[in-house]
Amino acid sequence: METRNILENLSCIDHSYSLSEADAFAGLSKYISEEASIRSCAKCEAALVKAHLKLRGQLTDAIASELDKVAENIDPQEVYTEEEKTKHNIRALVNVMKTKVNAEIGPLIHLGATSVDILDTALSCRMRDVTQNVVLPDL
Protein backbone atom coordinates (compact mmCIF):
# COMPACT_ATOMS: atom_id res chain seq x y z
CA MET A 1 0.00 0.00 0.00
CA GLU A 2 1.28 3.45 -0.89
CA THR A 3 1.56 5.99 1.91
CA ARG A 4 2.11 9.72 2.02
CA ASN A 5 3.17 12.30 4.56
CA ILE A 6 0.02 13.70 6.21
CA LEU A 7 1.48 17.22 6.04
CA GLU A 8 1.05 17.00 2.26
CA ASN A 9 -2.73 16.51 2.57
CA LEU A 10 -5.08 19.03 0.99
CA SER A 11 -8.02 17.98 3.15
CA CYS A 12 -8.95 15.34 5.70
CA ILE A 13 -10.33 13.02 3.00
CA ASP A 14 -7.29 13.11 0.71
CA HIS A 15 -6.32 9.53 1.32
CA SER A 16 -9.46 8.50 -0.59
CA TYR A 17 -8.65 10.48 -3.73
CA SER A 18 -4.97 11.33 -3.93
CA LEU A 19 -3.88 8.12 -5.62
CA SER A 20 -6.52 8.17 -8.38
CA GLU A 21 -5.66 11.77 -9.35
CA ALA A 22 -1.95 11.73 -8.51
CA ASP A 23 -0.83 14.35 -11.05
CA ALA A 24 -3.50 16.86 -10.08
CA PHE A 25 -2.88 16.17 -6.41
CA ALA A 26 0.88 16.70 -6.78
CA GLY A 27 0.35 20.03 -8.53
CA LEU A 28 -2.10 21.27 -5.94
CA SER A 29 -0.15 19.94 -2.97
CA LYS A 30 2.74 22.32 -3.65
CA TYR A 31 0.39 25.22 -2.93
CA ILE A 32 -2.49 24.16 -0.70
CA SER A 33 -1.19 21.41 1.57
CA GLU A 34 -0.44 21.96 5.25
CA GLU A 35 3.27 21.87 4.41
CA ALA A 36 2.72 24.59 1.79
CA SER A 37 0.78 26.64 4.33
CA ILE A 38 3.65 26.54 6.82
CA ARG A 39 6.20 27.47 4.16
CA SER A 40 4.01 30.29 2.90
CA CYS A 41 3.63 31.69 6.42
CA ALA A 42 7.41 31.51 6.80
CA LYS A 43 7.82 33.46 3.55
CA CYS A 44 5.43 36.13 4.86
CA GLU A 45 7.38 36.38 8.11
CA ALA A 46 10.60 36.71 6.09
CA ALA A 47 9.06 39.43 3.91
CA LEU A 48 8.00 41.33 7.03
CA VAL A 49 11.54 41.21 8.43
CA LYS A 50 12.92 42.41 5.10
CA ALA A 51 10.48 45.33 5.15
CA HIS A 52 11.58 46.32 8.66
CA LEU A 53 15.24 46.13 7.68
CA LYS A 54 14.69 48.04 4.45
CA LEU A 55 13.01 50.89 6.34
CA ARG A 56 16.00 51.00 8.69
CA GLY A 57 18.45 50.96 5.78
CA GLN A 58 19.87 47.66 7.07
CA LEU A 59 18.68 45.17 4.45
CA THR A 60 21.58 43.57 2.60
CA ASP A 61 21.54 40.96 -0.13
CA ALA A 62 23.11 38.49 2.30
CA ILE A 63 20.40 39.01 4.91
CA ALA A 64 17.63 38.81 2.30
CA SER A 65 19.13 35.58 0.98
CA GLU A 66 19.40 34.15 4.50
CA LEU A 67 15.76 34.94 5.22
CA ASP A 68 14.60 33.44 1.92
CA LYS A 69 16.60 30.28 2.60
CA VAL A 70 15.17 29.92 6.11
CA ALA A 71 11.61 30.36 4.83
CA GLU A 72 12.05 27.96 1.92
CA ASN A 73 13.70 25.27 4.02
CA ILE A 74 11.52 25.46 7.12
CA ASP A 75 10.77 21.98 8.43
CA PRO A 76 7.01 21.61 8.98
CA GLN A 77 7.57 18.73 11.39
CA GLU A 78 9.83 20.94 13.50
CA VAL A 79 7.09 23.57 13.58
CA TYR A 80 4.52 20.94 14.62
CA THR A 81 6.83 19.72 17.39
CA GLU A 82 7.19 23.29 18.66
CA GLU A 83 3.42 23.77 18.39
CA GLU A 84 2.92 20.91 20.84
CA LYS A 85 4.67 23.15 23.40
CA THR A 86 3.23 26.55 22.43
CA LYS A 87 -0.28 25.42 21.48
CA HIS A 88 -0.16 28.14 18.80
CA ASN A 89 0.78 27.56 15.16
CA ILE A 90 2.28 30.95 14.33
CA ARG A 91 4.11 31.30 17.65
CA ALA A 92 5.63 27.89 16.93
CA LEU A 93 6.70 29.01 13.45
CA VAL A 94 8.22 32.21 14.84
CA ASN A 95 10.11 30.28 17.52
CA VAL A 96 11.54 27.88 14.94
CA MET A 97 12.50 30.68 12.56
CA LYS A 98 14.27 32.55 15.35
CA THR A 99 16.56 29.55 15.87
CA LYS A 100 17.61 29.68 12.23
CA VAL A 101 18.50 33.34 11.76
CA ASN A 102 21.14 35.67 13.12
CA ALA A 103 20.31 36.66 16.72
CA GLU A 104 20.05 40.33 15.70
CA ILE A 105 17.32 39.52 13.17
CA GLY A 106 15.27 37.24 15.42
CA PRO A 107 13.39 39.98 17.30
CA LEU A 108 12.10 41.35 13.99
CA ILE A 109 10.28 38.12 13.12
CA HIS A 110 6.55 38.75 13.55
CA LEU A 111 7.15 42.32 14.75
CA GLY A 112 4.02 44.40 14.18
CA ALA A 113 1.94 41.52 12.84
CA THR A 114 -0.86 39.42 14.21
CA SER A 115 -1.15 35.72 13.53
CA VAL A 116 -4.15 36.44 11.34
CA ASP A 117 -2.10 38.94 9.33
CA ILE A 118 0.40 36.20 8.55
CA LEU A 119 -2.18 33.46 7.93
CA ASP A 120 -4.36 35.60 5.64
CA THR A 121 -1.44 37.02 3.67
CA ALA A 122 0.04 33.55 3.23
CA LEU A 123 -3.32 32.16 2.10
CA SER A 124 -3.74 34.98 -0.42
CA CYS A 125 -0.27 34.32 -1.83
CA ARG A 126 -0.93 30.58 -2.09
CA MET A 127 -4.27 31.10 -3.84
CA ARG A 128 -2.62 33.51 -6.30
CA ASP A 129 0.18 31.04 -6.98
CA VAL A 130 -2.01 27.94 -7.36
CA THR A 131 -4.32 29.85 -9.71
CA GLN A 132 -1.46 31.13 -11.88
CA ASN A 133 0.65 27.97 -11.84
CA VAL A 134 -1.86 25.10 -11.69
CA VAL A 135 -5.45 26.10 -12.41
CA LEU A 136 -5.07 28.51 -15.34
CA PRO A 137 -2.46 26.48 -17.25
CA ASP A 138 -4.77 23.44 -17.07
CA LEU A 139 -7.78 25.26 -18.54
Question: For each predicted feature, which ranges?
Answer:
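A helix-coil-helix interface module used to build multimeric assemblies
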Residues: E2-L139
